[in-house]
Structures are given as structure tokens and as C-alpha cells.
């Protein structure tokens, strides 16, 4: 098959869970004999036609590596018309691009909690973020023929937000081997620690939606019970300076270690030195870092939330308190009984085998084939006319968004600075 992978961003601009899944899909689909082309936005000079990566020009969004673009290059448009299946991996600047240019079945995988990210990265209070996503999520997802949810709990979330396209559950997968059998397993000495400490590890972005601040507070409480507790943090992000200050404020400088970013093929080596994996995030869809830690034989201490509950069996492969405030007790329970923690880690390793990327790709290919059998080579009815009508509808949604966030006289000053007083138009779209 000629398969197009459409992503709003791609390596090297951004490396996150969605980008990693696109890379894994490409590698394994090509190993099966399929022809895969990645379509994304970015600096056109970074395109690598020989490797099957086509970037269309976009405007850089700050210094985070993301780009904004309203159309694909002529080359990308033409190539998309030649695809037999298009698989999209972002809600915005992905599905709508495929809908405009492709003439084949479109699949969309929902990798992100857009409701929580909208609340975290805009001045919107969470109820307002939820309200706008109840409009945008079904509208954009509705451009696809089938939606993939990486977990059952995320399928329910999509239904709750009004997505009505056929939704199938295909769990994200990983390359298990580097975690099951690390090439160069690390030891406590590589952290500068003695062998008798209990070492927790967190791997992920250092940003507000991951709730690393909350994790530090829970670790501080656990350290009062288990003084030999240590936490190694792998990753970078916009909250790093704030997190370092929080560590000092909590008097955790001696037991929290910021390890920065290590090459991905070395992550399994570092996990091999840890006793447990911890996260306080409630914004996950199907967390690859949790699955990787399980494959490395680590028990999980995490907050019960969508995505997490589909990976971790509480009391078997780790502990999942229903509230973040109970995470310290989960950590203490693991540290106080190392033998039980090791047994849970072995159970986690066994459970991780169902997340093999080969299984994920096989199920996805079955989905592609079923769509091709029932909806081959679709000629979409006047896609540009439908696009124009949809943009008019989206302009109305933006006006609703403006009504939601425009501050009152007693409103939030932060929102007032972000949104011009006396207008209901989106920034850059005020009436002339």
C-alpha cells in the first residue's frame, strides 16, 4: 500500500509520543513492504524526499519547534492524491490537510488530551476549554473515516466530547527489546548513589500538563517516611527552572536528580538501575513512558486517570491511587517492601508484551485493508467547497471562544492582557 502519515510536527523539530509513534509506524510498515510518506509542516529544507519525509512551509510558533500552516506545498498536495490510505496523528493541521487533498480513506489516531492541553496552554478556565473542545473535537475528527483511540478509556472520552465517527481501539506499541534486554544497563553508581537507596524514576516532558510539581510534593511527603528515597528526572521542558526552585524549596536537593535528556536508545539502560517509575500526570492517552518502564521490569506508581488505567493493574503491576494526594502512600508502599516491588515489576514486564509495536501495526494494517475494501479511492464531494463552508463554521466557533474568554470588569487580569477588551474577534481577526 501507499500510505501517507500526516503529522502537525515531526522530528527533529519536536520529539514526543505522537512523533515517536509516526516513526515506529513508518519503520514497521516499510519492513512489511508498504510505501510510507510522512507529510508535515516545517522548514522545507529539512525535507528528505529519499527518506519519504515531505515538509510544507509554515510559520514557526515560538521556540517550541511547532509550525503553523494553512496549506500544503504543491508537491505535498500532489503526493497526497497518490496515497491509498492516509493516517493522521494530530487533530489540527493534520486531519483537515488530509481531507483537503487526499482522495482515499482517512484514519485519525487521537494521541492527545486536547481538552487538558487547551486548559493548560491558554488563559481559558477548564470548563471553557471543555466547551470549545466539544465543538472542535467532533468537527475535526469528523473529517476522518475512522478514529483510532489508543485505549478504551480514551474511546469513552472521545464519545463524551461528541465524536461520532466509528472509533476503534488499537493500543500504542513500543519496541520492547531495548527495555526487556538493555544493551548497557546502568547501575546506582552512574547516578552517584549507593546501592542501598530506593530509586524512583520519571521520564517525560517538564511542563504543567505533566504535573511534575505535584509529583515533587508527593515525593517530599514520601521522603519523610523513607529517607533513603531518591528520584531521577529525565527530560526537559518549559517548567525546568520552576521545578529546580521547587526542589530547593522542599529541601529535596540531596535526593532529586535532574538527568536532562539522554538518547532514546539509552533510556532502557537507565531504567534498568531504577526500582520504580512514578508519574502524577492525568493528561495521558496511552503513555509510552509507562509502557517502557513496565517492559524494563519496574512497578508503576501513578494517579488513576484515562490512559494510565489501561496500562497499569493496581495491586498487580503497581499502585494507582484515585487522587494525586495518595501518590506518596503508593511510593512508600513500594519502597517499604522491595521484594513486593520486584514482584510487581516482573508482573509489569510480563504485561508489557501486549504492547509490542508489531501487534499495533498488524491491527492497523487490518483496519487499512477493511477501509480499502469498503471505501476505495474516494472522490470527495467538492472538498474545496466543503472546506470553505467549514472555515465559516470555525470562524463562528472562534467567536464563541472569544465570548468565553473575554474578561468582565471583575475578570482575570491575565485573561485581560491576552484578549483585547471590547472585542469578540479572535486575535488577528478583528473586523476592519
Where are these regions (language model features)?
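Carbohydrate-associated surface elements
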Residues: 153, 173
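A short helix/loop element that forms part of the nucleotide-sugar donor recognition site in Leloir-type
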Residues: 73-75, 180-193
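Conserved donor-binding/catalytic core segment of Leloir-type glycosyltransferases
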Residues: 194-219
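Membrane-proximal helix-turn-helix segments that form the acceptor-binding/catalytic region
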Residues: 114, 129-146
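Nucleotide-activated donor-binding/catalytic signature segment of Leloir-type glycosyltransferases, i.e.
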Residues: 244-262
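Conserved acidic donor-binding segment of nucleotide-sugar-dependent glycosyltransferases
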Residues: 314-325, 333-338
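Short hydrophobic beta-strand element within catalytic cores of glycosyltransferases
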Residues: 299-302
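Aromatic "clamp/platform" in nucleotide-sugar-dependent glycosyltransferases that forms part
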Residues: 91, 282
Amino acid at each position: 500500500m501507499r500510505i501517507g502519515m500526516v503529522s502537525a510536527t515531526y522530528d527533529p523539530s519536536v520529539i514526543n509520543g505522537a512523533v515517536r509513534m509516526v516513526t515506529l509506524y513508518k519503520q514497521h510498515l516499510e519492513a512489511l513492504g508498504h510505501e510510507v510518506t510522512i507529510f508535515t509542516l516545517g522548514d522545507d529544507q529539512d525535507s528528505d524526499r529519499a527518506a519519504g519525509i515531505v515538509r510544507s512551509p509554515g510559520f514557526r510558533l515560538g521556540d517550541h519547534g511547532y509550525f503553523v500552516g494553512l496549506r500544503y506545498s504543491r508537491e505535498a498536495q500532489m503526493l497526497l492524491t497518490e496515497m491509498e490510505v492516509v493516517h493522521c496523528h494530530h487533530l489540527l493541521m493534520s486531519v483537515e490537510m488530509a481531507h483537503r487533498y487526499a482522495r482515499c480513506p482517512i484514519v485519525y489516531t487521537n494521541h492527545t488530551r486536547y481538552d487538558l492541553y487547551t486548559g493548560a496552554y491558554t488563559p481559558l478556565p477548564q470548563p471553557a476549554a471543555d466547551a470549545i473542545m466539544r465543538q472542535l473535537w467532533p468537527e475535526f475528527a469528523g473529517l476522518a473515516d475512522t478514529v483510532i483511540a489508543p485505549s478504551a478509556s480514551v474511546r469513552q472520552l472521545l464519545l463524551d466530547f461528541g465524536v461520532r465517527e466509528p472509533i476503534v481501539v488499537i493500543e500504542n506499541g513500543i519496541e520492547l527489546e531495548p527495555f526487556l534486554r538493555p544493551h548497557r544497563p546502568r547501575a546506582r553508581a552512574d547516578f552517584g548513589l549507593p546501592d542501598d537507596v530506593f530509586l524512583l524514576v520519571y521520564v517525560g516532558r517538564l511542563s504543567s500538563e505533566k504535573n511534575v510539581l505535584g509529583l515533587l510534593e508527593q515525593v517530599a511527603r514520601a521522603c519523610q517516611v523513607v529517607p533513603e528515597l531518591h528520584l531521577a528526572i529525565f527530560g526537559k521542558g518549559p517548567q525546568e527552572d520552576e521545578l529546580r526552585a521547587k526542589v530547593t524549596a522542599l529541601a529535596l536537593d540531596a535526593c532529586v536528580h535532574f538527568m536532562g535528556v539522554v538518547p532514546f536508545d539509552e533510556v532502557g539502560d537507565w531504567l534498568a538501575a531504577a526500582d520504580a517509575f512514578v508519574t502524577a500526570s492525568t493528561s495521558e492517552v496511552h503513555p509510552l513512558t509507562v509502557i517502557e518502564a513496565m517492559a524494563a521490569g519496574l512497578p508503576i506508581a501513578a494517579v488513576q486517570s484515562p490512559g494510565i488505567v489501561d496500562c497499569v493493574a493496581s495491586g498487580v503491576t503497581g499502585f494507582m491511587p484515585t487522587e494525586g494526594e495518595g501518590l506518596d502512600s503508593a511510593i512508600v508502599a513500594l519502597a517499604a517492601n522491595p521484594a513486593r516491588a520486584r514482584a510487581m515489576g516482573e508482573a509489569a514486564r510480563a504485561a508489557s508484551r501486549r504492547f509490542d509495536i508489531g501487534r499495533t501495526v498488524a491491527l492497523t494494517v487490518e483496519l487499512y485493508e477493511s477501509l480499502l475494501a469498503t471505501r476505495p479511492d474516494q472522490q470527495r464531494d467538492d472538498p474545496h467547497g466543503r472546506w470553505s463552508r467549514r472555515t465559516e463554521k470555525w470562524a463562528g466557533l472562534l467567536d464563541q471562544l472569544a465570548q468565553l474568554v473575554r474578561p468582565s470588569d471583575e475578570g482575570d487580569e491575565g485573561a485581560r492582557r491576552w484578549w483585547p477588551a471590547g472585542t469578540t474577534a479572535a486575535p488577528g481577526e478583528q473586523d476592519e
